[in-house]
Swiss-Prot record:
NCBIfam families in the cross-refs: PRK00228.1-1 (NF001266)
UniProt similarity note: Belongs to the UPF0301 (AlgH) family.
Name of the protein described by the UniProt record: UPF0301 protein HD_1794
InterPro entries: AlgH-like
Record GO cellular component, one term: cytosol
HAMAP family noted in UniProt: UPF0301 (MF_00758)
Any matching Pfam family: DUF179
Length: 186
């Protein structure tokens, strides 16, 4: 009915009754007969990528400029002590990488973080702590129950749009706008 969801966005609808996922956009990294894994791409933590690297004691090969927008994201409620790095394709192979699409990879090993600031680093990336998982067919049921909208993913929204604008932008890609703004108070 839905086909392979890997490499797509799911967007939480107002029907979503779990506050954890309210107004989230999730990038689906793996979808197969064993279930689904994705990461929330619009919920930044208070931790920057630079702070994470410092806490992990990585020695940067050369200085790299980090902006305030490069925050670690809350990828989901599962395995919150593990890093999930979604990044553009590189010529370098990292230890635990999984091809999501022809140009996007998910890596869960620290060697990708260690590459930051070197020639082997991915050009674009998001760093998430934790992920979101579904049992086989569970996500398809949630989509059928109108908890999620399904959308094609794009690199602009995934890597470049500000975190807090990603939900609106993902909805606008589906032609949904205007009604998304939060209601004001008198």
């Amino acid at each position: 009915m839905f086909g392979n969801l890997q490499g797509k966005f799911i967007i939480a609808t107002p029907e979503m009754d779990d506050e954890y996922f309210d107004r989230t956009v999730i990038y689906i990294c793996e979808h197969n007969d064993n279930g689904t894994i994705g990461v929330i791409i619009n919920t930044p933590t208070d931790l920057s990528v630079l702070e994470l690297l410092t806490r992990m004691d990585f020695q940067m090969a050369k200085p790299r400029i980090y902006t305030q927008d490069q925050m670690v994201l809350n990828g989901g409620p599962v395995n919150q002590d593990r890093g999930f790095i979604v990044h553009s394709k590189t010529d370098h192979e990292f230890t635990h990488s999984y091809k999501v699409t022809d140009d996007i990879t998910l890596t869960t090993s620290g060697d990708v973080l260690d590459s930051f600031g070197t020639q082997t680093a991915p050009e674009k990336f998001i760093v998430c702590l934790g992920c979101s998982t579904w049992k086989p067919h569970q996500l398809e049921q949630e989509i059928a129950q109108n908890y999620w909208l399904l959308s094609e993913a794009n690199n602009q929204t995934l890597f470049e749009t500000s975190y807090l604008d990603r939900w609106v932008e993902a909805n606008e890609m589906l032609g949904i706008s205007g009604i998304l703004a939060p209601a004001g108070r008198a």
